[in-house]
Amino acid sequence: MNIPVMPKSIISIINYQSDAIVSKQLLKKNNGTITLHAFDKDESLNDSTSPYDILIHVLEGTIDLKVNGTSNLIKTTEYFSLPAKIPYSIEAKEKTKVLLTVIK
């Protein structure tokens, strides 16, 4: 894991890939992880559940975050905190970069 010595734009760390979700783990510790995801438009992460609390932060773009069947439109600079063991899914409404923080 490379931690930059100088400030770096977080959205420049990862690039979009056509018809895919690209992931890059930025930090992995005993108490949690931080992962950057780049979703191409209409790509989705379906029926996920985390055993830990998570924070979903949209850095660029827009997602439809479904939690227990309820849609939440999350846009650039907005975030959503999700308790452990709650089912969720993410669909990118446009090309979107998301920072996912898991706290154990």
Where are these regions (language model features)?
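Structural motif
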Residues: 33, 62-64, 87, 97
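A short, N-terminal "cap"/entry segment at the start of jelly-roll beta-barrel domains
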Residues: 1-31, 66
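A cytosolic small-molecule/anion-sensing beta-strand core signal
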Residues: 59-60, 75-76, 94
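Conserved short histidine dyad/triad with adjacent acidic residue
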Residues: 20, 33-50, 76
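Ligand-binding loop in jelly-roll beta-barrel domains
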Residues: 84-104
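Short acidic-glycine-tyrosine-enriched beta hairpin
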Residues: 69-84
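Glycine- and acidic-residue-biased ligand/ion/polar-headgroup-sensing regions
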Residues: 52-64, 68
